[in-house]
């Protein structure tokens, strides 16, 4: 694989600050770009939002976003320009040839992204032009679907499609502004062009409370960033590849891996929260009114903090983490596969798309495979617990305080321990790295899944079949008694007649 060298703008001050605080200069640029969303929001609200000419708004967003992109990636900014221009001209030429347009648009963007991954890939996460480009790929693919949905009759569209369909293609300047939106192009979130247009047209401006909500999100993001940095200082990734980790007691190993996974997760959460705070401050994220009649500014939220911190299962993590991207995949991939008439295949295809979208590393594919297997197993366990355990022992268990305490501890322990297993491959990426960590914890994740599958299917085969057989015998006995009773009554009936 070719060695990649990035052509970034030289900045001695940035290099000096980065070395002084002990972080890579690329990471410092990324953080500063995310934080730049707040002064950009202040400038827009103070000077630009009151200007009637919408062209000025589009120029402001396109210019700020492209400038911040250049600050991070230098001349590699041209990759995003190629992507935007390609989709723009494809719309001009092929919009009414729906299937051809969608196929070319999808294949072009995914192929370009995968080629980018191929030429820039390494053993670690790299803050290169491919990072914002993967966000842009989803935006351009989703935009393509919205354009073609605009050609359909209203009756042919789903509720989601009605909210995002575009009857009229935007201008090139509008598309550039939408694509380079300052607080949305780098790490997400995804939002449709219709939301951007409504925002620029002032449809959200009369609603209050966005600045306060944005500041709260900023505070949460700063808190998670601090916890992440402190936690990973004590539990760095490299520690889990060492012989010292493998020599720790098994229970301590799996708990250390679980807490490390939490801290690693907070790295992404902090970036999303800081970005969301800037988007809220600028006023893009209005969702409607909450149950108390107050403005709800969570329209671009990418994480559900309450569910993330109080959830007990991997499914809770899936529902609370990277919410915005999951919603995008649900709307533009999963639901578009409805013609397959099989939810399992559609779900598997959606997870496969997410894995490919992340890159070539085997860790991504193992992560999404584990997600599928673990969530499926959790559903089986829930079904077994509610259908088998509770009907027989529920009256005892539900009245026991000791059981309730043990139940809580078990779920929380599972939550921490299995999070470590599931996130290992995602962080270490390469097979030769994540398999070392799996081996160091004795492959406990695989072991549990195999043991549960053996038990569950054995139970279904023997106990369920015997239960059905017993139920059938009971029914036959009941039918026999009923017939006998009928026969005994017949003479009496004849006498009465």
Curated annotation (Swiss-Prot):
EC top class named in words: transferase
Residues bearing glycans: 398
Lipid bilayer topology: Multi-pass membrane protein
Active site positions: 322, 358
Recorded catalytic activity of this chain's protein: a 1-acyl-sn-glycero-3-phospho-L-serine + an acyl-CoA = a 1,2-diacyl-sn-glycero-3-phospho-L-serine + CoA; 1-(9Z-octadecenoyl)-sn-glycero-3-phospho-L-serine + (9Z)-hexadecenoyl-CoA = 1-(9Z-octadecenoyl)-2-(9Z-hexadecenoyl)-sn-glycero-3-phospho-L-serine + CoA; a 1-acyl-sn-glycero-3-phosphocholine + an acyl-CoA = a 1,2-diacyl-sn-glycero-3-phosphocholine + CoA; 1-hexadecanoyl-sn-glycero-3-phosphocholine + (9Z)-octadecenoyl-CoA = 1-hexadecanoyl-2-(9Z-octadecenoyl)-sn-glycero-3-phosphocholine + CoA
Region: Disordered, residue numbers: 469-497
Keywords from the UniProt entry: Acyltransferase, Endoplasmic reticulum, Glycoprotein, Lipid biosynthesis, Lipid metabolism, Membrane, Phospholipid biosynthesis, Phospholipid metabolism, Phosphoprotein, Transferase, Transmembrane, Transmembrane helix
Tissue specificity of this protein: During gastrulation, expressed mainly along the midline in the presumptive mesoderm. During germ band elongation, expressed in mesoderm and endoderm primordia and in the cephalic furrow. Expression in mesoderm and endoderm lineages continues during germ band shortening. At the end of this process, no longer detected in somatic mesoderm or endoderm layer with expression restricted to anterior and posterior domains of the visceral mesoderm.
Skewed-composition ranges (Basic and acidic residues): 470-497
Residues annotated as transmembrane: 31-51, 74-94, 100-120, 173-193, 213-235, 264-286, 339-361, 408-428, 435-455
Subcellular compartments: Endoplasmic reticulum; Membrane
Highest taxon of source: Eukaryota
A single BP term in Gene Ontology: sperm individualization
Catalytic activity, EC: 2.3.1.23, 2.3.1.n6
GO cellular component: endoplasmic reticulum; membrane
Keyword Phosphoprotein among UniProt keywords: yes
Single GO MF descriptor: 1-acylglycerophosphocholine O-acyltransferase activity
Modified residues (Phosphoserine): 480
Pathway: Lipid metabolism; phospholipid metabolism
PANTHER family, per the entry: LYSOPHOSPHOLIPID ACYLTRANSFERASE 5 (PTHR13906:SF14), PORCUPINE (PTHR13906)
Its biological purpose: Acyltransferase that mediates the acylation of lysophospholipids to produce phospholipids (glycerophospholipids). Highest activity with lysophosphatidylcholine (1-acyl-sn-glycero-3-phosphocholine or LPC) producing phosphatidylcholine (1,2-diacyl-sn-glycero-3-phosphocholine or PC) (LPCAT activity), but also converts lysophosphatidylserine (1-acyl-2-hydroxy-sn-glycero-3-phospho-L-serine or LPS) to phosphatidylserine (1,2-diacyl-sn-glycero-3-phospho-L-serine or PS) (LPSAT activity).
Annotated family: Belongs to the membrane-bound acyltransferase family.
Name assigned to this protein: Lysophospholipid acyltransferase 5
Organism: Drosophila melanogaster
